[in-house]
Amino acid sequence: MLCLSLNSSSTSPPKLPLHHSFSRRGIRSWVRSPCVQRKKLGFWSSPKAVLSAVSGAGSEAGKVEEAEEYDAIVIGSGIGGLVAATQLAVKGARVLVLEKYVIPGGSSGFFQRDGFTFDVGSSVMFGFSDKGNLNLITQALEAVDCKLRTIPDPTTVHFHLPDNLSIRVHREYDMFISELVNYFPHEKEGIRRFYNECWKIFNSLNSLELKSLEEPMYLFGQFFRKPVECLTLAFYLPQNAGDIARKFIKDPQLLSFIDAECFIVSTVKALHTPMINASMVLCDRHFGGINYPVGGVGGIAKALANGLVNKGSKLLYKANVTKILLKDGKAVGVKLSNGREFFAKTVISNATRWDTFGKLLKVEDIPQEEKNFKKIYLKAPSFLSIHMGVKAFVLPPDTDCHHFILEDNWGRLELPYGSIFLSIPTVLDPSLAPEGHHIFHIFTTSSIENWEGLSHKEYEEKKELVADEIITRLEKKLFPGLKDSVVLKEVGTPKTHRRFLARDSGTYGPMPRKVPKGLLGMPFNTTAINGLYCVGDSCFPGQGVIAVAFSGVMCAHRVAADLGFEKKAPVLDAALLRLLGWLRTVA
């Protein structure tokens, strides 16, 4: 087993059985998480406890004892799981995080090849603002005395759409609205009214202290302090972005653009995207902005993991949880693939709901509520990812960092390989690639069914064929000479993401089977199994960096109340949970 040690005197680099070929320099940069202590905010400093991956049977300082009972065990170290774990650790809870892989972060992790540092998933980072209450990444890092340097992105995304519709979503809100109005002058009023509705929701959220919506004392407190804001959110909770947009906008092409905006948020069109989810993203990109962490997105998880250890909790790598242990109907621990068992007062699953209730629990232990969830939501498709190192000459001057490409047909938006999302983080942080080179992160929708039943040879050939088609499209649309500029290429399929991210079918997350009633059907953090909680994109409010961080904050608050680290009102708790359960049944 590999674990994070509190031994700050370790001098030898960890021996990691990586599937990526990390350089020694790369491993050392991972060990020294780029964390700035609050007392030394003017410069980079070494963290108080070095993140060292050591044998579980080795250093006593980092040894994880099976007989030891924790306040909480967290399955998985995605952003949602790490935020929940660190928030609990700060409150005084003893937390054990169990991670299947050898580095933290999940979809927000990283890997290195030949001098290139790649983000595993999205490079579009929200939550780093220094203002408001939705700067959840900043808050999570500050809670464990960490701060990351970031680089502001002047353009959230550059859309390249059918009929030569080319729209930049500028960081400055008025610039974005002006550009959109220039394309659709006849919809000027409708554009402003739709986005004003988004701001109404965002400003309400941003004014509230964000904690668990399953904790009645918090809810009552917020309602009495901010009744208008709370009622605003309650009003929009069952509504979808597409319905709101159609109240103000009639132009079919502009409505298709709103669909593309929402597709980036939720992998579905606006009519299926909850208005609250859409508003968080469509407004925070202008309020707090997109800010890229220096050194890559993986720095977020590294800093949170280091902060967790510094607060006295533990993180165990290569810890593949295969079973949640129940006693008298209560979650009391977990079992690993090697037979080791760990016990805690509560268990928090950062796995998807399909993994949690389809693999980690026996069929007879699955509550009816979770069976109902699967009737409302299905697994969104996975994606094909292409990580490339390219020569710098291929980028035109003033190329934006993020691009969304849908060349010729709006009807292809949701189809496999129909649209392409491209990030070039070296536009912001050149240190991620060798001099004279850039990084391309390319993502497009793909389903695991299209990759099953192939021989190894057929699988590899299909990867190359599909990747070549995607690269050809980018070359034709944006980057002439792209193919000749490629010096490194790694292609990931839904099977890759299922294996390394431990996500059932490699899914991006849940999506509604039919037009949803906003977020009413989305479960929160508690489950029908006593002592078991869920966190991440299978919980309210859904997918995205802000959303899963919000989920982590909410989960930590609810668990802390149940453990006695926060005030609670048992009678009100029971009534509220029954009400929330009933609301999900009418979704």
Curated annotation (Swiss-Prot):
Subcellular location(s) per record: Plastid, Chloroplast membrane
Pfam families xrefs: Amino_oxidase
Transit peptide: 1-50
Entry EC number(s): 5.2.1.13
Record bears the keyword Transit peptide: yes
Keywords on record: Carotenoid biosynthesis, Chloroplast, FAD, Flavoprotein, Isomerase, Membrane, NAD, NADP, Plastid, Transit peptide
GO biological process, one term: carotenoid biosynthetic process
Tissue specificity statement from the Swiss-Prot or TrEMBL entry: Up-regulated in the flower buds and flower lip tissue, while it is weakly expressed in leaves.
Reactions the enzyme catalyzes: 7,7',9,9'-tetra-cis-lycopene = all-trans-lycopene
Function: Carotene cis-trans-isomerase that converts 7,9,9'-tri-cis-neurosporene to 9'-cis-neurosporene and 7,9,9',7'-tetra-cis-lycopene (also known as prolycopene) into all-trans-lycopene. Isomerization requires redox-active components, suggesting that isomerization is achieved by a reversible redox reaction acting at specific double bonds. Isomerizes adjacent cis-double bonds at C7 and C9 pairwise into the trans-configuration, but is incapable of isomerizing single cis-double bonds at C9 and C9'.
Protein name: Prolycopene isomerase 2, chloroplastic
Species per Swiss-Prot/TrEMBL record: Oncidium hybrid cultivar
Taxon lineage: Eukaryota, Viridiplantae, Streptophyta, Embryophyta, Tracheophyta
